[in-house]
Amino acid sequence: MRRGSGDAAVADAIERSKTTAARNIPQLPDLPLPEDTANLRLGPDLNNELLAVLPLVGVWRGEGEGHDPDTGDYPFGQQIIVSHNGGNYLKWESQTWVLDADGEYVRPDLHETGFWRISGDGIPGSTNEEVVELLLAHSSGIVELFYGQALTQSSWELATDVVIRSTSGVLVGGAKRLYGIVEGGDLAYVEERIIADGELRPHLSARLSRYVG
């Protein structure tokens, strides 16, 4: 890393927050429930059980690269919304869309929604160590349960424990995901997925900038 690049990244993040700090996800009125918020400055306090995944809260937008075993590599755009209402879970929604070689929209692609949860007592070395859970339902007709752990205060590694496919769902194997907050405060991730030959292969990767929070 070049000298001063860290300071520049912090300065960029501060400048960007002047816009993102005032934003939040839209709400419909007249419900007697705590409002969902993707901005830790607004709405209910984050549940103490979720401190291990606190940096994920926000709305993230950017571009990435996907790999299809049949058609090869392709670029995509993505938005991820991570919100909470004070409960002991984070709400997760991710949508991607295929881009052409010029970065223009082509069609919708992947859509998943679910919840991040934390189990265990958080005591290193105990028999009930802290575990990160991610439960996802996909528009492609599959449901997945990931288990993993926080590698640091701003990175998380997970792997599927269960993959359930509906009658009309796509045929896929298990997956591993690695998420992390990287230089400049962006959210980056990679996903590897088991394909027909039984090997884990690169499937998705992206770097997303904070849009809300």
UniProtKB/Swiss-Prot annotation:
Its EC number is 5.99.-.-. The keyword Methyltransferase does not apply. A motif (GXWXGXG) lies at residues 58-64. The keyword Membrane does not apply. Binds 1 heme b group per subunit, that coordinates a highly solvent-exposed Fe(III) atom. It is an enzyme of class 5 (isomerase). Coiled coil: none annotated. Its cofactor is heme b. InterPro entries: Calycin, Nb(III)_bact/plant, Nitrobindin, THAP4-like_heme-bd. Pathway: Nitrogen metabolism. Gene3D superfamilies: 2.40.128.20. Heme b binds at K176, H203. Keywords: Heme, Iron, Isomerase, Metal-binding. GO terms for molecular function: heme binding; metal ion binding; peroxynitrite isomerase activity. It catalyses: peroxynitrite = nitrate. SUPFAM superfamilies: Lipocalins. Heme-binding protein able to scavenge peroxynitrite and to protect free L-tyrosine against peroxynitrite-mediated nitration, by acting as a peroxynitrite isomerase that converts peroxynitrite to nitrate. Therefore, this protein likely plays a role in peroxynitrite sensing and in the detoxification of reactive nitrogen and oxygen species (RNS and ROS, respectively). Is able to bind nitric oxide (NO) in vitro, but may act as a sensor of peroxynitrite levels in vivo. Homodimer. Forms a 10-stranded antiparallel beta-barrel structure able to accommodate a hydrophobic ligand in its interior. In fact, this fold hosts the heme group, which is located in a wide surface cleft. Belongs to the nitrobindin family. This is Peroxynitrite isomerase 2. It comes from Rhodococcus jostii (strain RHA1).
